[in-house]
C-alpha cells in the first residue's frame, strides 16, 4: 500500500451489506462457502460492533464480521447469528472476512484481522475462533493455531484459534 493511500476502517452500515455480499461471493463462491445477503444483514443487526469494513479509494475493499459465543465449539456453515450470538460470550468467532480481489496483497486482510482482535479485547473475549478454507497463512501471522481440519458438505475447513489472553493487549 502506498504512503498516500487513504484507508478507513469503520463499522459496517446497512448500505454496505450488498457490497460486502459481493466481496464475499467473489472470495468464497469457488469454495462453496459464500454467505447470503440476509445472513450479513442479521449479523450487522445482532452485533454491529463486531462488523467492520475497510474503505480505500472511496470503495469498500475488505470486511470482517464476528459474533460472541458462551462456549467453545466448532463454527458451522450457514449458521443463524440470531441463534448463535451471545452478547455476554467471551469467545469471539470470526464468521466471515475477505478482501476484494483487486485489493489483495496490500495488507488489508491483516488490518481487518488486527481490528477484529482489538474488538475481541474490548469485548472482554478470551479466545478467537474461526474456520478457513484457504487463508491459513494470514491467521498464522497473528499467532492462530490450527485446532483441526473438518469437512462439511464436502468442503475441507481448518478450524483455527487464538488465545488472546496470552496474545497481549496490542493487536
Features from the language model and the residues they span:
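Conserved acyl-donor/pantetheine-binding loop and adjacent beta-alpha core of acyl/acetyltransferases
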Residues: 60, 64-96, 104, 152-157
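Conserved GNAT acetyl-CoA-binding A-motif
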Residues: 113, 118-133
Amino acid at each position: 500500500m502506498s504512503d498516500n493511500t487513504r484507508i478507513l476502517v469503520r463499522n459496517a452500515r446497512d448500505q454496505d451489506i450488498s457490497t460486502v455480499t459481493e466481496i464475499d461471493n467473489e472470495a468464497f463462491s469457488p469454495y462453496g462457502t459464500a454467505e447470503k445477503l440476509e445472513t450479513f444483514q442479521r449479523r450487522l443487526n445482532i452485533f454491529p460492533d463486531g462488523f467492520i469494513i475497510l474503505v480505500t479509494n472511496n470503495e469498500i475493499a475488505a470486511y470482517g464480521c464476528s459474533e460472541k459465543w458462551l462456549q467453545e465449539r466448532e463454527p458451522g456453515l450457514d449458521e443463524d447469528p440470531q441463534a448463535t450470538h451471545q452478547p455476554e460470550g467471551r469467545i469471539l468467532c470470526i464468521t466471515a472476512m475477505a478482501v476484494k480481489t483487486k485489493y489483495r496483497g496490500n495488507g488489508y486482510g491483516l488490518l481487518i484481522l488486527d481490528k477484529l482482535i482489538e474488538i475481541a479485547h474490548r469485548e472482554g473475549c478470551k479466545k478467537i475462533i474461526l474456520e478457513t478454507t484457504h487463508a491459513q497463512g494470514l491467521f498464522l501471522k497473528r499467532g492462530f493455531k490450527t485446532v483441526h481440519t473438518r469437512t462439511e458438505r464436502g468442503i475441507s475447513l481448518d478450524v483455527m484459534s487464538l488465545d488472546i489472553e496470552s496474545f497481549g493487549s496490542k493487536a
